[in-house]
């Protein structure tokens, strides 16, 4: 099963979403445990670690999309490794 497409694919999308919803960097990034300065670096095109991308999806996607990602992660963790 393929992983669900994450809601953000670029720093520009993240910044636009944050501004559209009237949040400052501290509010937006704090929801996923990232400092304002860390969020600022991510919004300046620094690579965003996959765990942070996943948290952003869970925090800001619709409930249905968030649940699909969590379900996928749970199944992925419990599926046997091929050849093991």
Residue ranges and their predicted role:
Residues 64-84:
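Short, charged recognition helix plus adjacent turn
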Residues 7, 25, 48-49:
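Alpha-helix N-cap/helix-initiation sites
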Residues 1-20:
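A short, Lys/Arg-rich alpha-helix, primarily the initiator
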Residues 48-69:
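DNA major-groove recognition helix of helix-turn-helix/homeodomain DNA-binding modules
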């Amino acid at each position: 099963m393929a992983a669900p497409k994450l809601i953000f694919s670029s720093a520009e999308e993240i910044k636009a979403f944050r501004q559209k919803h009237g949040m400052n960097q501290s509010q937006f990034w704090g929801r996923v445990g990232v400092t304002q300065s860390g969020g600022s670096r991510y919004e300046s095109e620094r690579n965003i670690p996959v765990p942070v991308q996943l948290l952003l999806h869970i925090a800001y996607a619709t409930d249905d999309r968030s649940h699909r990602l969590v379900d996928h992660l749970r199944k992925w963790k419990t599926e046997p490794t091929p050849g093991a």
